[in-house]
Amino acid sequence: MFVEHNLIKNIKIFTLAFTLTVVLIQLSRFISPLAIIHSSYIFLAWMPLCVMLSILFIFGWRGVVPVLCGMFCTNLWNFHLSFLQTAVMLGSQTFVVLCACAILRWQLGTRWRYGLTSRYVWQRLFWLGLVTPIGIKCSMYLVGSFFDFPLKISTFFGDADAIFTVVDLLSLFTAVLIYNMLFYYLTRMIVSPHFAQILWRRDIAPSLGKEKRAFTLSWLAALSVLLLLLCTPYENDFIAGYLVPVFFIIFTLGVGKLRYPFLNLTWAVSTLCLLNYNQNFLQGVETEYSLAFILAVLISFSVCLLYMVRIYHRSEWLNRRWHLQALTDPLTLLPNFRALEQAPEQEAGKSFCCLRIDNLEFMSRHYGLMMRVHCIRSICRTLLPLMQENEKLYQLPGSELLLVLSGPETEGRLQHMVNILNSRQIHWNNTGLDMGYGAAWGRFDGNQETLQPLLGQLSWLAEQSCAHHHVLALDSREEMVSGQTTKQVLLLNTIRTALDQGDLLLYAQPIRNKEGEGYDEILARLKYDGGIMTPDKFLPLIAQFNLSARFDLQVLESLLKWLATHPCDKKGPRFSVNLMPLTLLQKNIAGRIIRLFKRYHISPQAVILEITEEQAFSNAESSMYNIEQLHKFGFRIAIDDFGTGYANYERLKRLQADIIKIDGVFVKDIVTNTLDAMIVRSITDLAKAKSLSVVAEFVETQQQQALLHKLGVQYLQGYLIGRPQPLAD
């Protein structure tokens, strides 16, 4: 039963393909443009070749026999040849065509006859547009040397002048390069009428859309008018001389605006009209050489048209590719914030979840950028299996990821993700890294204007969440979060304004030894709205927004101005100034500080530079270089908050420091805590071995003062010694 079904199917396919071959070959012979050279008719485009290729493209190997039978019957009918002559002529016409198709099948695989205008275009152009016409002509020459044919067609088999052969060969090129797709679309629409709708929707209707409709209609109108003028029986030198170039210009303008199938069809129909009704188009073409030149021009422009379209589509593809790459983080390969901004309305009603990696910034400073990328990729690999198919993950600037969740139980799912992340280490270069995570979530309404404030509020809330690793919901805290983020922004603007206007207030707190000698530490305040802002409010924002170097330089310059107007004969230090850690990371900061002192003619011995405690340097070499340059210039270096971390010992070992300032955490309970006393004793012994001075901070009682002096501390600082007073006083 199955075999019978296949047999019936193959018979139907053979009948359809054979009928189409016979009918379309007769049609193609009828519409093929003709010319007369040396009293012999010659085709300007041999369109039966287009019919053969169209049948083979549509039916594949099942079209081989129908093509052979159809060509045999039409040759027998049209030329009244003997059976042998018909068979030999058939072989010369079809052998090279079938071989070229077989080579394409071998090179391109089973898809060799699909996507004719989009894929493997140049391979088909070479084998079918170049090799096949040359092969057919060589085959006919070879056959003509062994067999005799009627005078009517003998010129096609070599019994003609060279120019006749040239025009005949050009007619084969013209057929394949210009009219092949015209017959392919016609044949395919006959086989499958539904293809007409596909062709219209895919390749023609887009040109009639709202944006291109005016251009397309104007283009078609101009082409129609031009064809009417060129094809009219009325001969005119003006039409023939000036309007023919416009014909090529019109099609050049269509590149980029019209789809190639639409452009190719109009080009084929237009050239067919011009070659058949050629009173004006071929006016003045009186020799076969001129005719060969005209055909060569049409062939060349057809190839150029195809090339221009391919180049345009490739540039469009590259633009789309570059646009997509601009929407993707190049290192983590996650969609970035720009991708989120493209179509925010698509995410309306979904939950936006901000996941913060708390210590990623610090870790990346120590281990490098690639560690940061590795961590984000590891986190993504952990999160993606926990997300649904339509949920997304975005890379946000900084240390945050954005999860767009659409399922229920958002807070519970997000908390589960955070718990999993907090329970795992990320391994980098055989080192396990403990990363801290926090998250916050809120509903997004799809409004572009609310996207930025929402992300800002979620970011702040996620940062608060890192302290206890509990997910926070924005819905219940929106007012509070909005107030906090607005307050932070206003505070930052206030700080910037104060720095721009130089609204600094310098306070001095005494640092004294047993004899009451010493120097004062400079403490800065900011003036704003008639009030004073203390360091605990503005220093975190100054560090966070990279204003450290600017702030420290302004403090130093204000102090130097005061020193320049209040000279003193005292030798040794008069003040100390604390430099923030990020200031020392500036490569040229040492030179700028030195230039300030030279400008105001202040000796570097007058000011001690204090280095604040920091858990680790992101670029220790830059800091060490700056400190070394300052030390060489003559500054004395003090290490602040000494004893609270390994970094201080590491600094002490590498730096040529002059002073150690013991952190107040070891001083406040030193009278009652013997361990604090032992720590202070070890620090003073270490300082004595390196010939360093020691300063103790937060000294508030006489008992602390007495014990610290007994333990070897030379200088004391605190409310007992003196409270900060305005420098102007």
From Swiss-Prot:
Q: Which reaction does it catalyse?
A: 3',3'-c-di-GMP + H2O = 5'-phosphoguanylyl(3'->5')guanosine + H(+)
Up-regulation conditions: Expressed during exponential and post-exponential growth at both 28 and 37 degrees Celsius. Repressed by RpoS.
Q: Outline the extent of the EAL domain.
A: 488-729
What does the UniProt record say this protein does?
A: Phosphodiesterase (PDE) that catalyzes the hydrolysis of cyclic-di-GMP (c-di-GMP) to 5'-pGpG.
> Per its record, how is this protein called by name?
Probable cyclic di-GMP phosphodiesterase PdeA
Membrane topology, as annotated: Multi-pass membrane protein
Disulphide-bridged cysteine pairs: none
Q: Which organism is it from?
A: Escherichia coli (strain K12)
Q: Which Gene3D superfamilies match?
A: 3.30.70.270, EAL domain (3.20.20.450)
Under Enzyme Commission nomenclature, its number is 3.1.4.52
One GO process term, biological-process aspect: regulation of single-species biofilm formation
The record's PANTHER family line, in alphabetical order, gives: CYCLIC DI-GMP PHOSPHODIESTERASE PDEA-RELATED, CYCLIC DI-GMP PHOSPHODIESTERASE PDEF
Q: Which GO terms describe its molecular function?
A: cyclic-guanylate-specific phosphodiesterase activity
List the SUPFAM superfamilies hit by this protein, alphabetically.
EAL domain-like (SSF141868), Nucleotide cyclase (SSF55073)
Q: What is its main location?
A: membrane
GO cellular component annotations of the record: plasma membrane
Q: Does the keyword Membrane apply?
A: yes
> Which keywords, in A-to-Z order, does the entry hold?
c-di-GMP, Cell membrane, Hydrolase, Membrane, Transmembrane, Transmembrane helix
Location of this chain's protein in the cell:
Cell membrane
Report domain GGDEF positions. 348-476
Which chain regions cross the lipid bilayer? Answer: 17-37, 41-61, 83-103, 126-146, 163-183, 214-234, 238-258, 289-309
